């Protein structure tokens, strides 16, 4: 009896092998997708409060679809990119932004 086969949704769709081509390692894929899933979850939580701090899903979603499944589909469709950040470079940018904010604040007080 061969009927239509139903593909499982979630972690197996999109396939892990396809997802691994989007990042350098499994570890990075896990961190990347988990962070995005938390953002999607926070977005849905904020909808009721009227706050929109986070960006909602970038793909069409289904009823009761889990945030991790949505995040994995976004990664697979190349709607998100993962870039490595040099901690020293990030600290220098933050220091420059704080210095610029301090300069702007001191010019208003004069």
UniProtKB/Swiss-Prot annotation:
HAMAP family: RNApol_bact_RpoZ. It comes from Nocardioides sp. (strain ATCC BAA-499 / JS614). This is DNA-directed RNA polymerase subunit omega. Keywords: DNA-directed RNA polymerase, Nucleotidyltransferase, Transcription, Transferase. The RNAP catalytic core consists of 2 alpha, 1 beta, 1 beta' and 1 omega subunit. When a sigma factor is associated with the core the holoenzyme is formed, which can initiate transcription. Promotes RNA polymerase assembly. Latches the N- and C-terminal regions of the beta' subunit thereby facilitating its interaction with the beta and alpha subunits. GO terms for cellular component: DNA-directed RNA polymerase complex. It catalyses: RNA(n) + a ribonucleoside 5'-triphosphate = RNA(n+1) + diphosphate. GO terms for molecular function: DNA binding; DNA-directed RNA polymerase activity. Gene3D superfamilies: 3.90.940.10. InterPro entries: DNA-dir_RNA_pol_omega, Pol_omega/Rpo6/RPB6, RPB6/omega-like_sf. Its EC number is 2.7.7.6. PANTHER family: DNA-DIRECTED RNA POLYMERASE SUBUNIT OMEGA. GO terms for biological process: DNA-templated transcription. Belongs to the RNA polymerase subunit omega family. Disulfide bonds: none annotated. NCBIfam families: rpoZ.
């Amino acid at each position: 009896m061969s009927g239509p086969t139903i593909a499982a949704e979630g972690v197996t769709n999109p396939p892990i092998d396809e997802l691994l081509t989007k990042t350098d390692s499994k570890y990075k894929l896990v961190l990347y997708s988990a962070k995005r899933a938390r953002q999607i979850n926070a977005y849905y939580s904020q909808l009721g409060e009227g706050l929109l701090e986070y960006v909602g899903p970038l793909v069409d979603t289904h009823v009761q679809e889990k945030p991790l499944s949505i995040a994995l589909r976004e990664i697979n469709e190349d709607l998100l990119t993962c870039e490595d950040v040099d901690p020293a470079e990030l600290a220098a940018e933050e220091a420059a932004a704080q210095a610029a904010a301090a300069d702007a604040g001191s010019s208003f007080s004069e």
